[in-house]
Amino acid sequence: MHITPREQEKLMIVVAADLARRRKDRGLKLNHPEAVALITYELIEGARDGRTVADLMSWGSTILTRDDVLEGIPEMIPDIQVEATFDDGTKLVTVHNPIR
């Protein structure tokens, strides 16, 4: 099986997001990489589910709250940008202040 670098990156996001989700479900606060991975994964999947770029940009800031992450993490992530695959092609989704 041959996996392209882009596919490999997506798989790493899925694994990191899965770990973050399990830790969050256990009541643990997420660190920087976990928070970024979880939000990124949800945005990518939202695009595949048929949501619009505008919808994802506003929804992306509701995925995690300050209570879900370690102290100082929201300030470390001023925005998240991800190239997501939509029905009509790949588009850049930017979420400003994703953790509020």
Swiss-Prot record:
Q: What is its main location?
A: cytoplasm
Gene Ontology BP term (one): urea catabolic process
On induction, the UniProt comment says:
By urea and nitrogen starvation.
Q: Where in the cell is it found?
A: Cytoplasm
Q: Does the keyword Cytoplasm apply?
A: yes
Give the UniProt keywords, A-Z: Cytoplasm, Hydrolase
Q: Does the keyword Hydrolase apply?
A: yes
Pfam families in UniProt:
Urease_gamma
Q: Which CDD domains match?
A: Urease_gamma
Which EC number(s) does UniProt give?
3.5.1.5
Q: What pathway is this protein a component of?
A: Nitrogen metabolism; urea degradation; CO(2) and NH(3) from urea (urease route): step 1/1
Q: Which reaction does it catalyse?
A: urea + 2 H2O + H(+) = hydrogencarbonate + 2 NH4(+)
Q: What Gene Ontology terms describe where this protein resides (cellular component)? A: cytoplasm
A GO term for molecular function:
nickel cation binding
| Subunit structure of this chain's protein | Heterotrimer of UreA (gamma), UreB (beta) and UreC (alpha) subunits. Three heterotrimers associate to form the active enzyme.
Tell me the protein family, please. Belongs to the urease gamma subunit family.
Q: What is this protein called?
A: Urease subunit gamma
**Originating species:** Corynebacterium glutamicum (strain ATCC 13032 / DSM 20300 / JCM 1318 / BCRC 11384 / CCUG 27702 / LMG 3730 / NBRC 12168 / NCIMB 10025 / NRRL B-2784 / 534)
Q: Which gene codes for it?
A: ureA
